[in-house]
Structures are given as structure tokens and as C-alpha cells.
Regions:
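Canonical Rossmann dinucleotide-binding motif of NAD(H)/NADP(H)-dependent dehydrogenases/reductases
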Residues: 3-35
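Alpha-helical segment proximal to the catalytic Tyr-Lys
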Residues: 112, 154-158, 209
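C-terminal helical subdomain
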Residues: 164, 179-211, 218-220
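Conserved NAD(P)H cofactor-binding loop of Rossmann-fold oxidoreductase domains
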Residues: 76-81, 221
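Substrate-binding pocket helix/loop in short-chain dehydrogenase/reductase
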Residues: 83-96, 181
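Active-site helix of classical SDR
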Residues: 107, 141, 149
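Short C-terminal tail/terminal secondary-structure segment
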Residues: 212-238
Length: 238
């Protein structure tokens, strides 16, 4: 059973203090995995800014001081979202450091300690393929981690499976929406963190043993809709 297969597995979750990351971490804990979280928010987990090389090194060293192996890595930490009008060079670099460089470097630090059959999950976004105005830093980071996924999958062939998940609208407060916010979604509702956690659990299980290098979009079908003015889409209101 999927409830038993994660017992005593060593699981790492970045950005695991809140939202999707916390839900994923909690679901692994519920299944008796040994979970290590890093987040810049204060708490009982390892506290640090993963944009900093030395923080990632210290975090990896702490995990490896207690275990000689790692089974699962979930790169979830949220990059900064700012657009081209307001985002500075430094802020854009920071977003890429959190969203792309940190996942790459954390895997690099731990790759020699991955068990055979390890699983790496990178949390991207449906914004890796579609955009709203003024979201360049976030969108670039999410596109980067989606591409990093298939590169790592090939490099780590035979050692670990690497997949990414692209969430759509996920309400981390589990708000139940009615009206257009819900009905615009082909699935009929807005998503919640469990929708993502369930997929992460599946991808880390043996049931997904033939899946690697893939990106799975969990967005209630929003990115599959054709939207044309006046034709099952939006209407211009003057």
C-alpha cells in the first residue's frame, strides 16, 4: 500500500513551512517518512535562505550527518514574483537563484547519497507555459525548473527518477470558491495543496517507476481551454 512504502524514507522538502510544501511534508510524515524541511520562515525546521550557496551546503551537511542516504527530494521553494516594470536586476537574479540554481545545487550536493530508485520532484507552475503581465521573474524561474527536470532525469538515469509538477490555481487556505472562479475551471473548482501532494506521492512511489523527465500540469484543465473573444471565452466589455 502507498501508506506503507514511505516508512523510514529520508525526504527533503524545500519551502516546506507553508502551503504546498507543508502539505507535501505532512503527507510524507503521516506515512512515517523522515522529513527534513528548509525554509526561510522561522520554525523547528532548518531555517535559511536557499539562494545562498553556504546555506544549502549547511543544510545538506546536517541531513548527511544523520543519514547516509536520501530517498526523495522535493524542490518546492517559491521564487519572487515581479514584472519587467518593477523587478530589478538583483531581484530577477534572486528569483532564479531560489527557483533554479538552488534545486540544481541541492541535487548536486546530495546526488552521491541518493539511493538507487530515488525520486526528485520539482514544483514548477502552469506559468511555465502561459503568463499574465508583470510576472517575468516568477515565470522565468518556473520555466527554468521545468527544463532542469528533464536534464536531470537524463543525467541521473539509472539512479533517480526526476519529474516536475506544474500547479495551476492552488488556494493554500483551502477556500471553496463559487461562481466564475470555480466554473471557469473545467474541473469545476479551484485546486488545493492536496491535489499536488497526491501527485507527489504517486510520482515518488513504485507505481510511477516508468515515469521520468516528465512535467505534469495540475490546473483543473485551465491550460487546455481555447479562449477566443465571443466564442466560449471572454467578451470585451466597453
Amino acid at each position: 500500500m502507498i501508506a506503507d512504502i514511505f516508512k523510514d524514507k529520508v525526504v527533503i522538502v524545500t519551502g516546506g513551512a507553508n502551503g504546498i510544501g507543508r502539505c507535501i511534508a505532512d503527507e510524507f510524515r503521516f506515512r512515517e517518512a523522515v522529513v527534513y524541511v528548509i525554509d526561510k520562515q522561522e520554525g523547528e525546521h532548518f531555517v535559511g535562505d536557499i539562494s545562498k550557496k553556504e546555506v544549502l551546503e549547511a543544510f545538506a551537511a546536517e541531513v548527511l550527518s544523520k543519514h547516509d542516504k536520501v530517498d526523495i527530494i522535493v524542490n518546492n521553494a517559491l521564487p519572487l514574483m515581479k514584472g519587467i516594470d518593477e523587478c530589478s536586476y538583483e531581484e530577477f537574479q534572486y528569483a532564479l537563484s531560489v527557483g533554479v540554481t538552488a534545486p540544481f545545487y541541492l541535487v548536486k550536493l546530495l546526488k552521491n547519497h541518493l539511493v538507487d530508485g530515488a525520486s526528485i520532484i520539482n514544483i514548477s507552475s502552469s506559468r511555465d507555459r502561459m503568463s499574465q503581465p508583470q510576472t517575468e521573474s516568477y515565470t522565468a524561474a518556473k520555466g527554468g525548473i521545468a527544463a532542469l527536470t528533464h536534464a536531470l532525469a537524463v543525467s541521473l538515469s539509472g539512479k533517480a527518477r526526476v519529474n516536475s509538477i506544474s500547479p495551476g490555481w492552488i488556494d493554500t487556505a483551502y477556500t471553496v470558491y463559487e461562481g466564475p472562479d470555480a466554473t471557469q475551471q473545467p474541473a469545476g473548482r479551484v485546486g488545493n495543496p492536496m491535489d499536488i501532494a497526491h501527485m507527489a506521492l504517486f510520482l515518488c512511489s513504485d507505481k510511477a517507476g516508468f515515469i521520468t523527465g516528465e512535467n505534469i500540469c495540475i490546473d483543473g484543465g485551465m491550460t487546455k481551454q481555447m479562449i477566443y473573444h465571443g466564442d466560449c471565452g471572454w467578451k470585451l466589455e466597453k
